[in-house]
Each structure stands twice: as structure tokens, then as C-alpha cells.
A protein has these predicted regions:
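Extreme N-terminal starter segment of soluble prokaryotic enzymes
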Residues: 2-4
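Conserved beta-strand termini and adjacent loop/short-helix elements that scaffold enzyme active sites
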Residues: 6-8, 140-142
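Acetyl-CoA-dependent GNAT
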Residues: 7-14, 18-93, 103-110
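Short, contiguous strand/loop micro-motifs
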Residues: 33, 115-116
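Non-catalytic, surface-exposed connector residues within folded enzymatic/regulatory domains
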Residues: 79-82, 97-98, 151
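Conserved glycine-rich acetyl-CoA-binding loop
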Residues: 87-105, 122-130, 134
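Short coil/turn segments at alpha/beta junctions that flank glycine-rich nucleotide-binding fingerprints
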Residues: 97, 113-115
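C-terminal "cap" of GNAT-fold acetyltransferases
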Residues: 116-129, 134-135, 141-162
Length: 162
């Protein structure tokens, strides 16, 4: 298996990223989020995000198949000059193969002009928390509540690049 990390460029890549987003979201959150909220994350909604922000995404390709992606950019809280990893998803069949690490490293390189790169993670997403801690992200104490059919807590985690 040779996985390439690259920018999304073609309509086929955008559509494939949408499908990965939809499938990987289900795998990642079916046990963490209420079913009624899960039903709102449709393939059409994933297409919307893929088409709206293609320049802020890198995809992982195995052969001709998109198997993961990362979305990143400026931190969405405009009062803080920092980068943000907005989304990271890899197909379940590709877990444990180093693809997520490659995607994160590529995004951190793209965001290396920031001294801090933030992301939000669900408090109960133990798999994601363990992964990011292995990648040297640390919790900074910030939390927020989301209303996703029931209250869900997110915690902010940060990577210090300088």
C-alpha cells in the first residue's frame, strides 16, 4: 500500500472525499452521538462541505481510492491568531496504517506559520484523544457544550509548533 497525501483537485476527488466524510463520520460517531443527530449528517451535507472548501483539504489516496482527508485553516475564533484542524477522517479499513498521522503532519506543515494549532474533540472520543496526544497535542482547559439532540461536551486541544 502506497498512500499519497495531496490537495483535492478534481470533481472525482471532491466526490470521493464527500463519501469518505459520510462513511467515516458514521463509524466515528455512531456510539458517541444521538441517532437523530447522526441522521442529519447526510451525503449531501458532506458534499456541501467538500465543494465549499476544497482549498482547505488534503486527501489520502491509496491507488485511485480516497481513503481519508483532513480539513484545516485559520482558527475560526477570529480573536485568536492560530491555525485549526477542522476535520480528520480515515476509512475504518485503513485505521492503524499511519494515514491519519501523515494527514496531520501535512496539515501542520501547511499551518507552520502559526505558533498554535487548535482542534476540538468530543470529550468521550477516547480514540481521537489518544491519537492526538500521541501526535503531541495537549488539552488547554477550554471546553464548550454542543446541543446535538442532547448536550455533548467538546474539549479544545492544541499543538504548539514553535
Amino acid at each position: 500500500m502506497t498512500v499519497i497525501i495531496k490537495s483535492m483537485e478534481t470533481p472525482v476527488e471532491i466526490e470521493s472525499k464527500s463519501l469518505v466524510h459520510w462513511k467515516a463520520w458514521r463509524d466515528a460517531y455512531d456510539d458517541l452521538l444521538p441517532a437523530e443527530f447522526q441522521e442529519t449528517m447526510t451525503l449531501e451535507r458532506c458534499r456541501f462541505f467538500s465543494q465549499k472548501y476544497p482549498e482547505n483539504a488534503l486527501i489520502a489516496i491509496d491507488g485511485m481510492k480516497v481513503v481519508g482527508f483532513i480539513s484545516y485553516g485559520n482558527f475560526r475564533d477570529e480573536t485568536i491568531q492560530a491555525g485549526e484542524i477542522i476535520a480528520l477522517y480515515v476509512l475504518k479499513d485503513y485505521y492503524g496504517k499511519g494515514i491519519a498521522q501523515k494527514l496531520v503532519r501535512a496539515a501542520l506543515t501547511a499551518l507552520n506559520h502559526f505558533s498554535e494549532i487548535f482542534l476540538w474533540v468530543l470529550k468521550d472520543n477516547k480514540r481521537a484523544i489518544a491519537f492526538y496526544q500521541k501526535m503531541v497535542f495537549t488539552f488547554d482547559g477550554q471546553e464548550k457544550m454542543l446541543e446535538l439532540g442532547k448536550p455533548i461536551k467538546e474539549k479544545r486541544i492544541v499543538f504548539y509548533s514553535k
